[in-house]
């Protein structure tokens, strides 16, 4: 991913909006709600003083968490104006998300048929909930990284990581278990949610943060 987009840094581009990534194409019934039980659940379990270094994941494997940690650091990097996703504790936030009803798709309509070719306005069209998307997507992402560079994503240089993230975003990367775009869209959206939630003073006092259960909404 290039460091600048239309005259703005990557950080500016990612932080100036919290709209959904286009590839997700989900319903907007909850877009106006900024305080949500799911985010509160992930936040209240976390310790505001715990750093990314000493946090031990409870759902992701060590290898998966290394990918998440490296990726969010590239998606929202720190700069002279403030901390990035890593410093804000986004990896911990995403890991804790995986232990909430959101990650199991508890509030989603997940009955078939699923048709990925339908217009995006009709909502998410894969039979996969977030836990599955991350587990399969992380495996495919590291497999693609090894195919391209001989190393897993977390071991690559920053420039190499940026290039691979761009490939995931565009769909150029060839995943075998789900579309690369779908994996990237979830990762990007959850990174944004985690960053804004963890940066919100309400998170520190356990009063919740940003909505994260907006993602897939399918019409029946």
UniProtKB/Swiss-Prot annotation:
Class of this enzyme: oxidoreductase
Superkingdom classification of source: Bacteria
Main location: membrane
Temperature impact on function: Optimum temperature is 30 degrees Celsius.
Membrane topology classification: Peripheral membrane protein
GO cellular component: plasma membrane
Protein name: Gluconate 2-dehydrogenase subunit 3
Lineage, top ranks: Bacteria, Pseudomonadati, Pseudomonadota, Gammaproteobacteria, Enterobacterales
């Amino acid at each position: 991913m290039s460091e600048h987009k239309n005259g703005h840094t990557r950080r500016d581009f990612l932080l100036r909006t919290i709209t959904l990534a286009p590839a997700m194409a989900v319903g907007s019934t909850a877009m106006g709600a900024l305080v949500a039980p799911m985010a509160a659940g992930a936040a209240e379990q976390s310790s505001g003083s715990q750093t990314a270094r000493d946090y031990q994941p409870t759902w992701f494997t060590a290898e998966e968490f290394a990918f998440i940690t490296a990726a969010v650091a590239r998606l929202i990097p720190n700069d002279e104006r403030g901390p990035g996703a890593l410093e804000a504790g986004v990896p911990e936030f995403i890991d804790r998300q995986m232990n909430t009803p959101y990650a199991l798709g508890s509030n989603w309509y997940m009955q078939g048929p699923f048709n990925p070719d339908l217009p995006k306005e009709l909502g998410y069209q894969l039979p996969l909930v977030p836990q599955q998307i991350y587990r399969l997507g992380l495996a495919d992402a590291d497999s693609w990284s090894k195919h391209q560079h001989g190393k897993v994503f977390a071991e690559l240089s920053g420039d190499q990581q940026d290039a691979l993230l761009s490939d995931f975003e565009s769909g150029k990367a060839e995943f075998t278990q789900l579309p690369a775009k779908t994996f990237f869209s979830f990762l990007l959206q959850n990174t944004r949610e985690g960053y804004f939630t963890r940066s919100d003073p309400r998170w520190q006092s356990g009063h919740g943060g940003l909505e994260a259960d907006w993602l897939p909404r399918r019409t029946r």
